[in-house]
Amino acid sequence: MRPSGRAPHELRPIHFTRHYTRYAEGSVLVEFGNTRVICNASVEDRIPRFLKGTGRGWITAEYGMLPRSTHNRMGREAAQGRQGGRTLEIQRFIGRALRAVVDLAALGEVTVTLDCDVIQADGGTRTAAITGSYVALVDAINNRLKKRIITHSPIHGQLASISVGIYEGTPVLDLDYREDSTAETDMNVVMNEAGAFIEIQGTAEGHAFRMNELQAMLDLAKSGINTLLAQQTEVLAKN
């Protein structure tokens, strides 16, 4: 039995609130159960030095957690003078995922930065950040289309992300903190609308997993991501 009482294949309640902040070109509050992340997409007329003269743009991400987004207060990384390894790894993960569904040449010489701020953490913050960032990115691009800055969208696909794992010997979908902290296996999966994998991150914690368990987790991930993709499509269809 999962601590939440959910079935192994059951997602937490998922909600997207678009246009959550006033100034960003795209903004969403994404909620995976009690995990809540604000994703802001900002478009700037600059590109990394290595792209100068190529005509291509860039998609990048920054990720952070509010000090009291967790059970006990964490110190701000800014106060410590540097970002931690986990933070750097997660923001690279988010950026890589989003670049997989964007034509950077069609984007033009701009940088879109996805700022993902975790205001409450209960497991799955990086997967929520990726799933919410896609919605914010679409809104940012639609903003440029509406202003006729660009004539067609550089986004050529859709994506979402979810966690899966093995909890008390059972493959489960969308782990919350209580499950994630004691799971035998924890995995993060990103897939597109065609059912193809963009990234898989998986680690065994004490007990190695077998091929049949891996397949069971990937099947759960595909099912959950299909639900997330449908919810993204539904929320983006609204004004």
UniProtKB/Swiss-Prot annotation:
Record carries keyword RNA-binding: yes
Binding site residues for phosphate: 86, 124-126
Taxonomic superkingdom: Bacteria
Enzyme category, top tier: transferase
Pfam families: RNase_PH, RNase_PH_C
UniProt xrefs under PROSITE patterns: RIBONUCLEASE_PH
Membrane spanning stretches: none
GO biological process: rRNA catabolic process; rRNA processing; tRNA processing
GO MF term set: 3'-5'-RNA exonuclease activity; tRNA binding; tRNA nucleotidyltransferase activity
UniProt-listed Enzyme Commission number(s): 2.7.7.56
UniProt catalytic activity: tRNA(n+1) + phosphate = tRNA(n) + a ribonucleoside 5'-diphosphate
Keywords carried by this UniProt record: Nucleotidyltransferase, RNA-binding, rRNA processing, Transferase, tRNA processing, tRNA-binding
Xref: NCBIfam families: RNasePH (TIGR01966)
Subunit structure: Homohexameric ring arranged as a trimer of dimers.
PANTHER family assigned to the protein according to its UniProt record, in alphabetical order: EXOSOME COMPLEX COMPONENT, EXOSOME COMPLEX COMPONENT RRP41
Task of the protein: Phosphorolytic 3'-5' exoribonuclease that plays an important role in tRNA 3'-end maturation. Removes nucleotide residues following the 3'-CCA terminus of tRNAs; can also add nucleotides to the ends of RNA molecules by using nucleoside diphosphates as substrates, but this may not be physiologically important. Probably plays a role in initiation of 16S rRNA degradation (leading to ribosome degradation) during starvation.
Family: Belongs to the RNase PH family.
Protein name: Ribonuclease PH
Organism: Nitrosococcus oceani (strain ATCC 19707 / BCRC 17464 / JCM 30415 / NCIMB 11848 / C-107)
